[in-house]
């Protein structure tokens, strides 16, 4: 069973007027991981699709997604899959990949229907593509690692880059996840924006009672969303995107847009945040 929700894009002036319920309706993506289902959110931010697949012992096939206007989802798209659960298998284009927890798979345009099997909890990211690059499974030890932050600022972390120009080719998808060092809870702080790319976050590895306070909005008009385990949020190009957890967590970041330059950002000075 595949469920698809559509999210239209919103400008910053309209977003300023929203209350908590309105912000969550526009940007928060919960309930992506439902047993025995594929659940997708088709966003109008660079046409990024965000979703989850939980086979729970019965294979799930992702094929036609009506909002894409194509017979199969990968006819004119590429896909990244991150396994945030137990071991599972993903099959497409006549190949199969065994995915452990934390593995990331890239599937190119034209790979055909995608089958998810096993006990995995598969986080799905897809964006339009113009050509087919080779499919590739990337494990944590093969990702590019960037260490940032410090214990003194509670933001010491390792950024693991998987679908990234220095690791492999893609059309516009850039995907990785960030792991925190002991005692650090702040992500993407100091904050930044990147007007040429949207971004989506998935927060996971949270304890049941833990929460992440995700900050968004224009630097001069910040808002927050309270996030639980395995919940996602879409970040428009005009918005900051950072957060602070009540305990340890990991988050997947994914971008699509005009370029694949992870460093192409506009930093926001602390004194400019409101």
Swiss-Prot record:
<dbReference type="Pfam" id="PF04962">
    <property type="entry name" value="KduI"/>
</dbReference>
<dbReference type="InterPro" id="IPR007045">
    <property type="entry name" value="KduI"/>
</dbReference>
<feature type="binding site">
    <location>
        <position position="199"/>
    </location>
    <ligand>
        <name>Zn(2+)</name>
    </ligand>
</feature>
<dbReference type="InterPro" id="IPR021120">
    <property type="entry name" value="KduI/IolB_isomerase"/>
</dbReference>
<dbReference type="GO" id="GO:0042840">
    <property type="term" value="P:D-glucuronate catabolic process"/>
</dbReference>
<comment type="pathway">
    <text>Glycan metabolism; pectin degradation; 2-dehydro-3-deoxy-D-gluconate from pectin: step 4/5.</text>
</comment>
<dbReference type="InterPro" id="IPR011051">
    <property type="entry name" value="RmlC_Cupin_sf"/>
</dbReference>
<dbReference type="InterPro" id="IPR014710">
    <property type="entry name" value="RmlC-like_jellyroll"/>
</dbReference>
<comment type="function">
    <text>Catalyzes the isomerization of 5-dehydro-4-deoxy-D-glucuronate to 3-deoxy-D-glycero-2,5-hexodiulosonate.</text>
</comment>
<keyword id="KW-0479">Metal-binding</keyword>
<keyword id="KW-0413">Isomerase</keyword>
<dbReference type="InterPro" id="IPR027449">
    <property type="entry name" value="KduI_N"/>
</dbReference>
<dbReference type="GO" id="GO:0019698">
    <property type="term" value="P:D-galacturonate catabolic process"/>
</dbReference>
<dbReference type="GO" id="GO:0045490">
    <property type="term" value="P:pectin catabolic process"/>
</dbReference>
<comment type="similarity">
    <text>Belongs to the KduI family.</text>
</comment>
<keyword id="KW-0862">Zinc</keyword>
<dbReference type="GO" id="GO:0008697">
    <property type="term" value="F:4-deoxy-L-threo-5-hexosulose-uronate ketol-isomerase activity"/>
</dbReference>
<dbReference type="GO" id="GO:0008270">
    <property type="term" value="F:zinc ion binding"/>
</dbReference>
<feature type="binding site">
    <location>
        <position position="192"/>
    </location>
    <ligand>
        <name>Zn(2+)</name>
    </ligand>
</feature>
<protein>
    <recommendedName>
        <fullName>4-deoxy-L-threo-5-hexosulose-uronate ketol-isomerase</fullName>
        <ecNumber>5.3.1.17</ecNumber>
    </recommendedName>
</protein>
<feature type="binding site">
    <location>
        <position position="194"/>
    </location>
    <ligand>
        <name>Zn(2+)</name>
    </ligand>
</feature>
<feature type="binding site">
    <location>
        <position position="241"/>
    </location>
    <ligand>
        <name>Zn(2+)</name>
    </ligand>
</feature>
């Amino acid at each position: 069973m595949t469920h698809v929700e559509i999210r239209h894009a919103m400008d910053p002036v309209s977003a300023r007027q929203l209350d908590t319920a309105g912000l969550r309706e526009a940007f928060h993506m919960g309930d992506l991981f439902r047993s025995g289902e594929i659940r997708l959110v088709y966003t109008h931010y660079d046409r990024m699709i965000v979703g989850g697949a939980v086979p729970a012992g019965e294979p799930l096939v992702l094929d036609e997604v009506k909002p894409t206007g194509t017979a199969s989802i990968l006819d004119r798209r590429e896909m990244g899959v991150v396994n945030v659960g137990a071991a599972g298998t993903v099959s497409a284009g006549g190949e199969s990949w065994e995915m452990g927890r934390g593995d990331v798979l890239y599937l190119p345009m034209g790979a055909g229907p995608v089958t998810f099997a096993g006990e995995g909890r598969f986080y799905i990211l897809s964006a339009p593509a113009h050509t087919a690059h080779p499919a590739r499974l990337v494990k944590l030890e093969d990702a590019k690692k960037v260490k940032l932050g410090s214990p003194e600022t509670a933001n010491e972390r390792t950024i693991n880059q998987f679908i990234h120009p220095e690791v492999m080719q893609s059309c516009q998808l850039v995907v990785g996840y960030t792991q925190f060092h002991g005692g650090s809870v702040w992500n993407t702080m100091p904050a930044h924006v990147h007007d040429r790319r949207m971004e989506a976050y998935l927060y996971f590895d949270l304890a049941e009672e833990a929460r992440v306070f995700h900050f968004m909005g224009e630097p001069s008009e910040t808002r927050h969303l309270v996030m639980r385990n395995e919940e996602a949020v879409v970040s428009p190009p005009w918005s900051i995107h950072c957060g602070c957890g009540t305990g340890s967590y990991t988050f997947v970041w994914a971008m699509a847009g005009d370029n694949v330059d992870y460093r192409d950002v506009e930093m926001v000075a602390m004194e400019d945040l409101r």
